[in-house]
Amino acid sequence: MTGVKLSVCIPYKARLDNLTIALEALARQTMGAEDFEVIVGAMEYSVELIGACAPFCDRLNLVTVCSSREFHIPRARNLAMRSATGEVVVQIDADTMLAPEALQRLYDRCFAFGQRGCAVGQVVGYDNNTGGDIDSVELRPYEEHLAALREMASGPGWPADPRFRVEHNIPWAFAWTGLIALPAAAVASDRLYFDENFRGWGNDDLEWGYRVCASGIPIVLRPDVYGLHLPHPRNAAANSLTATANADRFLRKWPRRDVELVCLAGDTRGNDLWPSYRAALARASGAAGFGVAVGTADGGTALLIGVPVDGAGHPVDGEHLSYFDAGARVEIVPLTGIVLPYEPGEVALGRVGPRIARLPAAYRDAVLAEAARVSRRVVVEDDVVAGGGAVAGGDGL
C-alpha cells in the first residue's frame, strides 16, 4: 500500500460528459487529494478521454488504465481495481457525482479503524433514466447538480434511494456499484473481483455482492454517504435483454432461494418480501422450505419441484426418489422453483409436487409457469389439503 486511504475505481467507455462531472465532484471532496486516488478503467484509447482527464491532474491523484478489449462493465471495474493501491477500494460509476463530504465520511465512519466491512452509499436519481429509451440528455453544470442533491438531502423524502426505504433482509441484493466500498485486503484475500462472464448491463454487481456476503463480510447501508446519479443515454430494450441473461447466469452459478426470489421480484421488492416468503415456504412445505429434485426418469432429465426439506436443505423423507429411475443419482437443489436455471424445453419431465398448491397464488403461479417453460412435459400433482388452490396467508408479489 502507498499510504493512500481510498482508491476510487470508475469503469469507463464513451461517457465523457458524465465522467467530467464525476471527476469535478471528486476534485471538490473535503478529503485531501493526497488521501485518495482515482483510477479510471477505460475500455478505449481516445484523445478525448485524455483531454478530459488532463485538467484534473493537478487537482487529483488520477490514474487512467486503458485497454482496447471489448467493453464489459465487470472487465472495466477489474481493470481499475487491479491497479488500486489504497487501503479501501471504492467502486462508483462514471455517472455518479459524489457529495463533497462523501469520501471523508466513508473513511472516517466505516474504515478508519481497519473495519472489515462493505459500505453501501445512497445514489439518488436513478429514476431519471427509467421509463424507456433516453436518446440524448442535457447535463447541467456541476453546481446545479450539487444544488439539486443538497435540496433532496434536506427534504422530507430523505433517504431517497429506494434501497434505504425497505428492510435490509438480503444483504447482497443492495450491493449496487454506484457507490460501494470494501477493504483492498479483503478483495485480495477473497478474490473479490467481478465475474467477467457477465456481459452488458445488470446483475453483475449483485453477483459480486453475493460473493462479498458469502465471504463473511457484512454489507452495511450508509445513508450519510451519498451521491447523485447523472442522466445519460439509455437503451431500455438492450438493458432488459442483458439483465435477463445475467440473472439466468447468476442463478445457474448460485442456485439459492434468495437469488431466485430477487431474480423474480427484483432486489428492492425481494428484500421486502423475504421474511414473508420464508414463512410462506414453511407453511406450505410443512418443513423449512422446498427443494427441487433433479435426476432422470425414463432416461431423460427430470425435475420434481416442491420437495419438503429441513433447515440443512435435506429432504425430510425419501418419498421423492420414487419419481426417478431406479438407482439414478438425484440431487436436491435449494430452490423453490419460482425461477429455474434451465433453458426453455431443456427438461424432459417437470413434475410439480402437491404442496406447491399451498403457496400464495403469486408464487404457486410462478412455479407452474417456470415448470411449463423449462419442461417438454409437465405433471402437476393434486393436493388434497389445498384442493388445487392456494391456502390463505402469506404475501404475494
Regions found by a protein language model. Give the residues of each.
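Short, well-formed alpha-helical segments that are part of the catalytic scaffolds
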Residues: 15-29
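Acidic donor-binding segment of Leloir-type glycosyltransferases
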Residues: 26-66
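Glycine-rich, basic loop-to-helix element that forms the pyrophosphate-binding segment
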Residues: 67-84
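Short aromatic/hydrophobic "clamp" motif used to bind/position activated sugar donors
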Residues: 89
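Acidic donor-binding/catalytic loop of UDP-sugar-dependent glycosyltransferases
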Residues: 96-109, 360-365
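Conserved donor NDP-sugar-binding/catalytic core segment of glycosyltransferases
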Residues: 102-147
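Short, flexible, basic/aromatic active-site loop/helix in glycosyltransferases
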Residues: 139-172
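Acidic donor-binding loop at a coil-to-helix junction in glycosyltransferase catalytic cores
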Residues: 200-208
